[in-house]
Amino acid sequence: MSQEISEDLRDELAWFVQTYSGIVDFELDENLDPKRWFMPLDSYATRKEAAHYFLLVASLSDYQLTGNPRNIRLLLHHLHETFGKRIYTSTDPVVFKSGVLSYEQKMEIFDRLGQAKGEIPEVLCSVNVFVEKKARGDLIEYADGLFQKGWKPKDFAKELSYSVKRLNKHNKAKCWLYLRWMIRPSPDLCLFQFDPRDLMVALTTPKLRVAAALGLTSNEDMVFELNAKEMPENWWRDTAEFDADADRLNEFARSLFPDDPARVDFPFFILGTWLEYADLTPTFLMKSLRFLNQKHEELLQPLMRYLTVVSHYNRVGEVVPPGAFSGFEFDVYDFLRSKGVLFNYEFMEFCLPAENAGIDRFLTYKPDFLLPQFTDSGRKVILEPHGVGKNLKDVLFKLSVFRKHYGEFFCLILIVPDTFLQNIQNLDPSGNSYDYLWKQSDYKIQFEHFHKS
């Protein structure tokens, strides 16, 4: 049930939002690969295309459809390479089916689409039908027309929820995600004329975690249900309950930023992702906020950023296909898949201070395998297979810096070839670079023991 939120917690949240609201949304970030073919938005034609493209993005922002959010950019890039401008004009799902299938085959050792991936072609076509029939091919002009009539963003959201597949009921949160991108100023796109004060925060699962930790949800068991290993299929179907929770979260957002409540939207996504499978209490929320705010002050930049695809190269300098690129990594990847373990592969990059490393720049660390459902003393587990002997000292140093700054929240398991053990113990006798050190020859047995414990 709703509870009193302390002033200290409100202040930490406001500070966090003010800091992280200047960060470009993961889906809008043009520093990530692959690059969008229509950027920059320096003409009406490119802005018009962006309005259509990002409606496709929002419609696919559904774990059941696309799995990891990075798949959306990668899938649409693949479909554009395959079909060109037909990704905006096709209204026949059959056209897209082959493209979705070829994407999965291409990305087999990188990531997987969601369980409802078979609906992706129909979702894309329903967006195109809406743009063609309702908006007459121009979403910016359509939105401007609604604005001139005195309509509000909620009216546009209602039109979308009636017309586009999987944008109704609880999925209408995706309408608000789209409208936030289209209406808010930079780092959003500001393509529509509506007033940002009329926006709502999209109640997606990460933001529901924040709401639950704040005590804003009506269901007292929500903090436990959000951390269930397997949430039932009907979990989101109580639309009235989640509408009420969305209203409370938005009321809270307006109390922080009355002229721009959706300013909290992406910061709360970041915070809610941090809270995945964590203790959803005000105490742990405050602990996390203080850590994130303090580290940002130290680093003067965000602690982490989300990645799409990280380029790797073979020995002759050629880019290799996305995914677990070494035999060792692929063995771990395949093992985790065979065990049904949920993991994120190279999905996040952490910022690290230089720590007197003799360099004048920040270090970064990209975990190979983050296992969000596994914890060790309340910390999320990272598996780091490393089979390259070159620069081993530098690798151990980077891992030790990561553990020094993030070890309160993450447990790092380093997996290495058996022949590396003695060298690692010589280079790092105190074990500062890992919580656990496993041999390649028996890491599967070690994992089973770890899992049971």
Predicted regions and their residues:
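HhH-family (HhH-GPD) DNA N-glycosylase catalytic core used in base-excision repair
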Residues: 1-311
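Short beta-strand-loop-alpha-helix junction that forms the active-site gateway
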Residues: 319-320, 366, 370-397, 419-421
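Interdomain/boundary linker segments immediately adjacent to catalytic/signaling cores
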Residues: 301-331, 335
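Active-site metal-binding core of divalent-cation-utilizing nuclease and nuclease-like domains
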Residues: 313-324, 337, 342-377
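Short, charged, amphipathic alpha-helix that recurs within catalytic cores of restriction-modification
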Residues: 393-407
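Hydrophobic beta-strand segments of well-ordered beta-sheets in folded domains
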Residues: 379-382, 409-414, 435
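Acidic-and-aromatic substrate-binding clefts and catalytic sites of carbohydrate-active enzymes
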Residues: 350-362, 389-393, 419-423
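Domain-level recognition of nuclease-like catalytic cores that cleave nucleotide substrates
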Residues: 415-453
